[in-house]
Amino acid sequence: MEAGPVSGAVVGRFAPSPSGRLHLGNLACSLLAWLSAKSQGGRIVLRIEDLDAERCPRIYADLLEQDLAWLGLVWDEGGSTGGPHGPYYQSECADIYTGQYKKLEAQGLVYPCFCSRAQLHAASAPHTSDGNVIYPGTCRDLTAAQIAEKRKKKAPAYRVRVPDEEITFLDGCMGPHTENLLRDCGDFYLRRADGVFAYQLAVVVDDARMGVTEVVRGSDLLSSTTRQLYLYRLLGLQAPTFAHCPLLLAPDGRRLSKRDGDQSLENLREKYTAQEIVGKLAYAYGLQPEPAPCTPESLIPGFSWAKVPKQDVCLPEGLF
């Protein structure tokens, strides 16, 4: 197993991307992350994942803090609260990421990639479970002369080489999960052509330096975990445990997104109290038998991952 418990106190985290207002799916995952940590006597760190600062105005980060606090999902450090493990905004961490990126370069594992997204999709390459194209290795073995010629026309992104190796981990919600790095993931991005670091590297570096011992997030990120465990190993960092919660779907089966304004907390706050929203989400995820109003604190004693469904959760018609 690549992931194991970290000794000492449990540290969970909220890691939202502030590209819009929070919706019910975000809130459900945040509630589960908070309950998992608090039921073990742990702490919560709030990290703002605004790697692409242009898409993530600071106003949305401020609003999501207000929304989480209103619901009673209070964090112990991070965000505007600060703490000993800052910066807590990824847009302020480029120098930190650069240091770790250079460690991977020094191992001879990083190479430039000149492929466009359109080219990859046109190649009909297979996709990972999170919808990304499995990279076919087009630029993996370019010669120095070929790289120099391609640079004249286009700035490259950068990928990390992966071996033909299976990685298995025990997910706290979904159970054992195995993927082959080469066949199921492929060489993946570390840095975009514009210099912005990729999600996979940033979250590994941040979770490690913030002392996070438990990562709770949506099941759409399940296939990211093997890539991240690979990076933890290469960088000599301690990996946390993982629990991937089922996604929350609209009554018609659609996946909720920030474009679903009717399911955004901005609109829901006009119709329901914080306790009503928490109670309805707890009911949808099997944490209480009825959608009765409740506080997050009241759910701590009875929380167990065994109660949480393994399949995506479809909101009952009329619940919200």
What is the predicted role of each segment?
Residues 2-124, 128, 219-220, 224-237, ...:
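N-terminal Rossmann-like or analogous alpha/beta NTP/dinucleotide-binding catalytic cores
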